[in-house]
UniProtKB/Swiss-Prot annotation:
Transmembrane segments: none annotated. Binds the lower part of the 30S subunit head. Binds mRNA in the 70S ribosome, positioning it for translation. InterPro entries: KH_dom, KH_dom-like_a/b, KH_dom_type_2, KH_sf_prok-type, Ribosomal_S3_C_sf, Ribosomal_uS3_bac-typ, Ribosomal_uS3_C, Ribosomal_uS3_CS. This is Small ribosomal subunit protein uS3. Part of the 30S ribosomal subunit. Forms a tight complex with proteins S10 and S14. Gene3D superfamilies: 3.30.300.20, Ribosomal protein S3, C-terminal domain. PROSITE patterns: KH_TYPE_2, RIBOSOMAL_S3. CDD domains: KH-II_30S_S3.
């Protein structure tokens, strides 16, 4: 089962937590769920250049709090915070409620599965050789502390007439071990020959305590230990 299921969904409530953190009754649950989907789709399209790793949505008492994890937060914030204010107003219109916006910097994008998948997809669209893009991503992740990584690319790779799947793996990626901290991300590359799919699994070590927030807390501590840059976390009320 661990080989087929989404590794993040498999570990929810064990060492991972949900990206949508709110409760609702049956009457409004569907509406709020669709709002979340629209918000994520809008942010992923609008902020494509900012490298969005994930979007966390919380809804405390008829308000909405959106936390964007980004590799390039400066592109979201803009000059003197002008862009982030426009974005906050747009999200307020979409949710019909007061919206707060937080920006959190991802200081090690090389070990974030979603950002790695997006990077490989962008390289495929620029006609970079898929083997070179995959090997470079594997080497960068292992150099920056990943204990294991697996990448698969599927589609008409290199313009071949018959679609196929190619993969690389280095280190351990124990998908069936629930205490393993596995990050998983996907992306699509729209090439001239059709769409190529990219999947990335990154093993960051084991989490022994039973805590749904453990993975998120561990990622924050790892970013803080990385040093070098100033804290780009910003809250816009």
């Amino acid at each position: 089962m661990g080989q087929k299921i989404n590794p993040i969904g498999f570990r929810l409530g064990i060492n991972r937590t949900w990206d949508s953190r709110w409760f609702a009754d049956n009457a409004e649950y569907g509406q709020l769920l669709h709002e979340d989907l629209k918000i994520r789709a809008y942010l992923m399209e609008e902020l494509k250049a900012a490298g969005i790793a994930k979007v966390v949505i919380e809804r405390p008492h008829k308000k909405c709090r959106v936390t964007i994890h980004s590799a390039r937060p400066g592109l979201i914030i803009g000059k003197k915070g002008a862009d982030i204010e426009k974005l906050r107003k747009k999200l307020s219109e979409m949710t019909n409620s007061e919206t707060h916006l937080n920006i959190v910097e991802v200081r090690k994008p090389e070990v974030d599965a979603t950002l790695v998948a997006q990077s490989i997809a962008q390289q495929l669209e620029r006609r970079v050789a898929f083997r070179r893009a995959m090997k470079r991503a594997v080497q960068s992740a292992m150099r920056l502390g990943a204990e294991g990584i697996k990448i698969t690319c599927a589609g008409r790779l290199g313009g071949a007439e018959i679609a196929r799947t190619e993969w690389y793996r280095e280190g351990r990626v124990p998908l069936h071990t629930l205490r393993a901290d596995i990050d998983y991300g996907t992306a699509e590359a729209e090439t001239a020959f059709g769409i190529c799919g990219v999947k990335v699994w990154i093993f960051k070590g084991e989490i022994l305590e039973h805590d749904p927030m453990a993975s998120e807390r561990r990622a924050t501590e790892s970013d803080n230990q990385g040093g070098g840059g100033r804290d780009r976390r910003r809250e816009n009320a």
